[in-house]
Amino acid sequence: FNLVGKFEKRKNHKEVIQAWLKRFGNDNRYFLQCSIHNTFLKPEENSQIFSSIIGNQRYSNITFLTFMDTNAKYNDFLNSGDIVIGASGGEGWGLPEFHSVGLGKHAVITDATGYKSWATDENCCLIKAGGKEEIYDNVFFHKGAPYNQGRYHTLDADSFIDGCEKAIERCRKDRVNQNGLK
């Protein structure tokens, strides 16, 4: 599994990782690679965030990757996984997820926001969005600012895990997402 996008509240990264670890943590048949480094934060802030997500637990099947400074490195990352996760609750498009599906990767994608312009039941395992919450995190989203306002969809953890299990089954049948190549 590949988790993509710079770390932000609206992307539900923390909730995705915690739900994934609850179901698949230390099950070495599965691996979660997190390319969620946020270049707008200091390296130590990224490290603190990643540590806070998993707490004191030790997992053998998760890694947090640092910033990839070339498209070639990022492309290698996208090609290294069989399943991409796009669970953002406020996405304009989801370019890494879209690229991954176009590369023939299976995908677990929230059926909401900008994803709806390209993600279908045929090319992705669509998951339900959760409720809606205010977006404000006082880092990137400040109440009353002239931009980045509103609400985002939270993660429905049960739907997310169902989507992951469906993607695993699709991957077992054919490692290449033939519908993603269309």
Language model features with spans:
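Aromatic "clamp/platform" in nucleotide-sugar-dependent glycosyltransferases that forms part
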Residues: 89
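Short hydrophobic beta-strand element within catalytic cores of glycosyltransferases
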Residues: 106-109, 119, 123-127
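Short glycine/serine-rich donor-binding loops of glycosyltransferases
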Residues: 94-97, 112
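Short acidic alpha-helix that forms the nucleotide-activated donor recognition element
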Residues: 69-81, 98, 102, 116
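Conserved donor-binding/catalytic core segment of Leloir-type glycosyltransferases
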Residues: 1-11, 17-20, 32-33, 148
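Nucleotide-activated donor-binding/catalytic signature segment of Leloir-type glycosyltransferases, i.e.
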Residues: 44-76, 83
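C-terminal "capping" alpha-helix adjacent to the active site of nucleotide-linked donor transferases
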Residues: 131-175
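Glycosyltransferase donor-sugar binding loop
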Residues: 29-47
